[in-house]
Each structure stands twice: as C-alpha cells, then as structure tokens.
UniProtKB/Swiss-Prot annotation:
Gene3D superfamilies: 3.40.50.10950, HprK N-terminal domain-like, Isocitrate/Isopropylmalate dehydrogenase-like, P-loop containing nucleotide triphosphate hydrolases. It comes from Yersinia pestis. This is Phosphate acetyltransferase. PANTHER family: PHOSPHATE ACETYLTRANSFERASE. Residues 390-717 are annotated as: Phosphate acetyltransferase. The gene is pta.
Amino acid sequence: MSRTIMLIPTGTSVGLTSVSLGVIRSMEQKGVSLSVFKPIAQPRAGNDAPDQTTTIIRANSSITAAEPLNMNYVETLLSSNQQDVLMEEIVARYHENTKDAEVVLVEGLVPTRKHQFANALNYEIAKTLNAEIVFVIALGNDSPDQLKERIELARSSFGGSKNKNITGVIINKLNAPVDEQGRTRPDLSEIFDDSTKASVANIDPSQLFANSPIPVLGCVPWSFELIATRAIDMAKHLNARIINEGDIKTRRVKSVTFCARSIPHMLEHFRPGSLLVTSADRPDVLVSACLAAMNGVEIGAILLTGGYAIDDRINNLCERAFQTGLPVFMVDTNTWQTSLSLQSFNLEVPADDHERVEKLQNYVASHISSEWIDSLTAASERPRRLSPPAFRYELTELARKAGKRIVLPEGDEPRTIKAASICAERGIATCVLLGNPEEIQRVATSQGVELGKGVEIIDPVAVREQYVPRLVELRKSKGMTEVVAREQLEDNVVLGTLMLEKGEVDGLVSGAVHTTANTIRPPLQLIKTAPGSSLVSSVFFMLLPDQVLVYGDCAINPDPTAEQLSEIAIQSADSAAAFGIEPRVAMISYSTGNSGAGSDVEKVREATRLAQEKRPDLIIDGPLQYDAAIMADVAKSKAPNSPVAGRATVFIFPDLNTGNTTYKAVQRSADLISIGPMLQGMRKPVNDLSRGALVDDIVYTVALTAIQSAQADSAAS
C-alpha cells in the first residue's frame, strides 16, 4: 500500500515547486519508488500554460507524473455544485497513475486572489486521498513567534490538533531578501531599488525548529545562486535579436548593470555573471566589456538597447572577444523601457534549464529531514533500487565520510578549478591543485569561483626538487638519473603520482587535458598494481533513468585473454558491490549460451568458467548477447535458465573495441550520464578523465577516487 504525502502551500510565493522538486530528490536519493500526482493544474500566465511542476518533472526525470485537471474544468464542476464528481475523478486519476509506487507525492494548489477556494479544495483532496499533510510556508518578514502563529493558523484550517494526518511543515526561503509586505525581492540591479529596500532577517534555523507547533521536516535557506538565470532566457523574455550567440545557452546572469556612467566608474561591474545593459551607440562600453572578456572575465551577457546598428569596424575589433563565448543581444526599446521589461522577468526555473533544476533539487534536498524520508518506507519490504540520484548521493556521502586528499595535476585548468571548489563546498574531498598559484587564482576569479578552505594549491616549481631522490630510487633499475628525473618531474602527473606514492595524498585524478596514456603510465611505473591483481582495468557507471549499470572494460585493455577477462569480471563485480550495486555479471558476446562457435565466443565461455571457479560467491553467466542480458522478455526465450539474463547489472565486454563502442553508443543515443572510467587493480587509486569532461564529471570522479582510497585502507587493515 502506497503512502500518500500532500504538500500544501499556506499562501502565495512559498516556493512550492522548488520544495516539491527537493522532496522528490530526497526520496530518489534514498531509493524510494515514487509517483507524483498534481490533481489540478496551477493556473499561470494564461490558463492554457502547462502546470510548472508537472512540466519540470517530465523534462528532467523518468518519474511518473499524471496530467493534472485543467482549472477551467474544475471551476465549471464547482460552480455547478459537482464537487463530489470532481473528487471521484481525482481518485480515479490517482489510482490510474500511481500503481507500484511506495510513496505518492501530491502537490496542492496555491491559494490566489482569483482562486481563494484553493485551501478548502486542498483540504478536501487530502481527506479524499487519506494523505499525510505537510505544509509549505515561507518565512517572509515574520519573527519566529509570528511564524509559529501562522503555522498554528494553517493547522487549524485543516482540522487542528485532532487531524492526525498533519505530519509537519517545511519552511522555505529562510532569510530571503523581503520587502515590507514580506515578498521576496532578489536584488539583481541597482535600477530596481526604491524606497522600500529589501531586508534580510538572519534568523537562526534552530529557533524555528524549537518554536514550531508541529514537526519541522525541512528548513531551506534562501540561495541567490538558485535564481541565476541563463542569458538565453533573458533574451527570449525581451524578444531580443542575437548579435553574437556565444555561450548564450549556458552563461548565467547573476546581476544586471545599466552602463550609463563613464568607463572608469563602470569597471567594477565588469564581473562574472553580469548582464551589462548599454545603449548600442556606446561603443566604448562594448569595447571595454570585450577587453574584460578577452582577459578571462566570464561576463554573463551584453544587452544593447536602442536598436542602433553596430559599426562594422567595432564588430571586427570585438571579434576575438566574441569567440570567447560572450553573448550579445539587442532590443529596439530604449534603456528606460528595457529596464521596465527586465523588472517583469519571471525568475521561475524554466523546465528545459536542466542544470538549474538539478542544482535546485540537490540544494533543497540537502535541507529536508533524512529521518522523515527514511520513515516513509521503514515498513516496506521492497528492495531499494539504486536510481541515478541515489547513486550520486551515495557517492557524495561515502566520499564525505572518507575525508581524503585528492591531487589534481591539471590545477590551472578552468573545469578542474570549478570542480575543486564544488568538492570543497560539498565536503567531498580536499583537492590539491598543482600549478602556479597566481594563475590558478586568476582563472578562479575570472570564473567567479572562490577557492576557500578545502582547496590547497601547491606550486610545482617550489616542491619538485624534493621528489627527485625518490623517483631515482624507484626507477634506478631502468637507469633513472637525477637529470632525467628532473625532466620527468616537469610533468605534473609524475609529480602528483610521487605525492600519492609517498602517501602525501590519497588519490589522483587527471585527464581533462592529458591523454589516458599520460595519466596512467606514471602510476603503472611508480605505484604498480594492487596485491592479487595482474592487470589494471576500468569500468563506467552508466546512469540509466531507473537504475545504474556497470560496463567494463571500455577504456584500458585492447584484447584481453580469457584469464584477463575473468579478472576484469571479478574486479568489476567487486567495484559494483562497493558502490551499492548488487553484482549480476553478464559476459557479453555475439552469441548466447551454446548457440555459437568461434574463437571469440570460446574466449568468453572460458573466461566465464574461470571467473566462476575463482569466485563461486558471485553470480556470473555467459556468453550472453546484450539484449538477452538486459531484457527480461528476450532472456525468457534465449536463456531461460540463466541466473543473470534479463537482470544483469554488470556487463563485461570481450574487448576494447566492443566495450568502448557500446558505451558511447548507449550514452549518446539515450542521452545518459556516465561516470568514469574508474580504474581498478591499482595499489592506490588513480582515475582518468575524458578530455571532454564536464565539471560534474570531475566532481564525481574525485568522489569515486576518495571512496576507492577508503576501501583500499579498509582492505589493508
């Protein structure tokens, strides 16, 4: 029987969609099987606009989200005294769309001036579905005592203390900038200032927990970072013409500056994330902003007003700056009219802004009570599925507990610097950046990245000499001399590897710039393989919509022998288990069972036999075709007696050609996130990045490396 949780807003502007998305992410992180049910679409600009929460969920996850009823239809039923008919239809839709879910999350209606019946309707829906009620409230400009009164008032509207289905409250927008009416007013621009300046209360969350008449299930502080919109969204809102597209789809606008002053008085506003608004007949501002962009300042965008044509000579002068990704767009309205249009910009997260949705979900989820989420499925006997959010959450939590130092040899690379900052912020690991400290700080500043505690910077020039004797000692059998050692230590990967070998750091991550060979060769020469391992292999974690699969080896061994393939299978199974994935190993071939012959099939068959002999505790079967390994209906006909077919979680490919091709085909055609390659079999953890790695890829690879180090410590003790 599913548990039904209904989130009910106590008023307007409480951030209901954000809280709903955060609660969903909290449940995903705990592996809860859930459905989302919005009984009635929240009216937006124009009654035909789709429901915001439902649209975002469908665009950003595989969770079932039923189509809500249109408000016009609901109003027709209510006005004709057919509330019973409405409730029956809601119940029918509820049961149609929430089968097999452990938890059903229901989102209520926000009461507005036009829909003042929303509270009564929410209460009726909650009773009809026998839902546990969780209020969502924003702090506004209330004191803790005033907030307590508002929570008490909300509870009394839903049956008071006698209603045992009232579970608790989630307090949102803690310490947000608000005006005298308690409305949230993020300060994007000085032109928006007026006599009613926004204020921030700075209330300690512990006061709210102690003061609330019902349990506080979450307390979400205001975060300005979550409202940083894309430049493309600003351009669409203004119906602007694109002059230079650049990174318009990814650049974030964190502030708006109207450039009406002289250049010396404007320079402080030429900073990362600024939307610079200026008349198109001010080429001095445009050229100055372009100079800043060429110096590495990631300006959010430039908005030109007035519709004046840009002189071709100015365009040519700015060409190199445009190539840095600087977005430039233009409107025909003057600066004053444009400022009015900007004030009406809706800061809601667009459904297609996947990066912002992900950031918002993770942020809100981090402030939701994990004890409450655990309690939702405490009595369930269903095994937890490891969804992609659950896997990433598990990685982050395990890495935090490990508390490791990870060296990043490509310390001045922009993505690496951003990733190090994120790792420090989340407590994933202490990142050690190798590189010129001034250059690293310059790159960080130009990107608006702060490198505080949790990020160490080591200048290779200052420390290389102390590693020369150790390198000579380790490679003396190969004829290593001090002169050659100094030359090799010019490579930061070699330096980082020696730091790892000496135990000064716990792991190494490289490859954003270096090739796989350059990343792996020094560790193989200086650190060697782990005891009991005869080779190094790799796995990718493939984050499918509803589960995580392990692919090996897709990066290291070109054509392993049967003996090597069996070891890769065992290494991969152990890696899967270490990260919470139950290993059911499929040895992949073009033939299933005994249906085919040939040297390639025989190699897989022999590797399967060897792996089963070495590790009888593991569930391993092969040869299996990919479709038989992953699809239950195919498995029934091709391998009905296989313990793995149709339910494999670990896929071992016969060679690098097959593995790498399959991994990339699945990743690209299904638009999946993959984490890896994670190297297996090293004495100390070293991991390689793709040269096209995103910042998140680096973050999760650092987390993997930290966890591997903790596991190596555990195995050695």
